[in-house]
Swiss-Prot record:
GO terms for cellular component: host cell nucleolus. The gene is OPG061. It comes from the Viruses. This is Protein OPG061. InterPro entries: Poxvirus_F16. Coiled coil: none annotated. Belongs to the orthopoxvirus OPG058 family. Induction: Expressed in the early phase of the viral replicative cycle. Pfam families: Pox_F16.
Length: 231
């Protein structure tokens, strides 16, 4: 399957272009998709975008099987409306995939469906190890923060994996006793979204910790420097 990936940033809260591309690559490799082109946009995507040459070249090329987006909210209009606009210049149906949401928009008539999200054996084991570390009172924030960076690259990358595999991650949290991460599990061990949210919020704290650590390192290096006052 030949696909075109579409990145876009509409606000400071959106994932960076580079982060989106990394997520796309993993998703496309998992679904055996061949990336043949990349489109970068700023702001939400609507029918006006389709008027540009970059888009018309893609839409009119029936060898392109699908467009891959990061999230549904990248599209500023109805997904169905965007699909119909593209199909005016195509003879072959085109699919749309949304990596972050684990959704695809295709079929006849086209509609949303869930897609498989990749969480390989390595990531499964490392997430389990992370939960164990967070349950240990002897592990401080520095140790856990370094574990995240060493095994996932960044907190954002870890959160992307976790948010794409809510059911599995919540089941692992549910099977743990919750000590050290303040997660209460009901007696019948029901999987609750509250447990998942608490876990995610705990992880987000390590983004701040990392920034503070980097600032401390910069300040330490500055203290070592000899400042010469040139007159």
């Amino acid at each position: 399957m030949k696909v075109v990936i579409v990145t876009s940033v509409a606000s400071l809260l959106d994932a960076s272009i580079q982060f989106q591309k990394t997520a796309y690559r993993h998703h496309c490799n998992y679904l055996s998709m061949q990336v043949v082109k990349e489109i970068e946009e700023f702001g939400t995507i609507n029918e006006k975008n389709l008027e540009f040459d970059t888009w018309t070249d893609v839409i009119q090329n029936d060898e392109i099987d699908a467009l891959v987006f990061y999230r549904v909210k990248q599209i500023g209009i109805s997904t169905g409306v965007l699909y119909k606009s593209m199909m005016r210049n195509r003879t072959k149906p085109i699919s749309m995939y949304f990596v972050r949401d684990c959704l695809a928009f295709d079929g006849d008539p086209p509609s949303f469906r869930m897609t498989s999200c990749n969480i390989n054996a390595y990531n499964r084991n490392k997430i389990k190890d992370l939960i164990i570390l967070m349950n240990m009172k002897t592990c401080n924030k520095k140790i856990i923060g370094e574990f995240i960076i060493d095994n996932f690259g960044s907190v954002d990358a870890l959160l992307s994996i976790i948010n794409s595999n809510v059911t599995w991650v919540t089941s692992v949290i549910n099977n743990s006793n919750g000590r050290g991460i303040n997660i209460r599990v009901s007696n019948n061990k029901m999987l609750t979204i509250t447990s998942f949210r608490r876990f995610v919020n705990k992880l987000k704290m390590y983004k701040t910790t990392k920034c503070a650590s980097q600032l401390d390192n910069v300040c330490t290096e500055m203290n070592k420097m000899d400042i010469i006052d040139k007159k």
